[in-house]
Amino acid sequence: KRPIKGTIFFIFFISFISVFYSFLNIGFWGLFTLGTVPKLDDSRVLLAQGIISILLVVFAIMLYIINILDAYRNAERFNRNEEIKDPKARMVATWDKTFPYLLISPGTFLLIFVVVFPLIFMFGVAFTNYNLYNAPPRHTLEWVGLDNFKTLFTIGVWRKTFFSVITWTLVWTLVATTLQIALGLFLAIIVNHPVVKGKKFIRTVLILPWAVPSFVTILIFVALFNDEFGAINNDILQPLLGVAPAWLSDPFWAKVALIGIQVWLGFPFVFALFTGVLQSISSDWYEAADMDGASSWQKFRNITFPHVIYATAPLLIMQYAGNFNNFNLIYLFNKGGPPVSGQNAGSTDILISWVYNLTFEFNNFNMGAVVSLIIGFIVAIVAFIQFRRTSTFKDEGGL
């Protein structure tokens, strides 16, 4: 018997009910109905309150389950005639076990309300009719089930736009990220070669693009790529080749420019990352390879590349995930343009920039939430699969 623990949990239960009863009652009512009286009931507030109510109840249930499991373990010890600690010893043992969780609890609660809560709220919005024409509090929202998902995949303009945007998003992610990784690796190997002099100076110069804030670099490139007065056309391409591509207004050339800018922005980080790994590879590997008569390509394929990928695979995967959601470059360069006839997204819009336009330009919150869920699902699945396939995580026991 543990009367002190029972008393504490009883007080906690009574306090929880007395403090949160009204909040939970309104929260669960609002979660199911989303309000009944326009202008009086704000469906957004009711949805948020309902989600918080669920989180509070889940927290209380978890504490109750922990209490039950602890009581079960104590009963097992009692049935085995094991020594039962006195209350003071139990309190010390409990403190020792729970102290690490106590330290991380503020961060955990912050994570729940900064990350988990918005995700659940977005998930809820995806199943409502929240758009410009019935936005609360003037109107109350309604649950529409999977209608928004059906709209995305069955109605012509939405389906065409979605597949066009996701195709470009995948091309953009794979091409831009792979090129920046390849360039970073190539430069790191060249600079790390023993015959190259002035390595510190060269490395400093190559890392400089990373030191400049990316939005400043993007705005500079916007001016350089301007169709009418940009230096790239007027001072380089037109005098030398007699051509002046429409970098901002032609879909193909806009995509080429975006990929080029991202390679410029992204390769310094990869270069610095690979440089550190290359310097950590023991020279004994290369000396042994030289004794065996290995060529430069064989040393790269069998020594350099495996070492680099093993050490940096998780970070490289995050590079792909980051570019998949690279909103800043797409929006600052030309806001996803130029426009495409018959679609509600620009020719260079990726999924994340399309979500921004749907939400803040067209106030189509429900469809923006649907696309956001698809983005999260794609990134999570791909990242999880790739992480599990990397040697780094396999050696740590996997996921």
In which residue ranges do the predicted regions lie?
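Short helix-adjacent coil turns
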Residues: 1-2, 363
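Juxtamembrane loop-transmembrane helix junctions in multi-pass integral membrane proteins
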Residues: 40-47, 51, 91-98, 194-197, ...
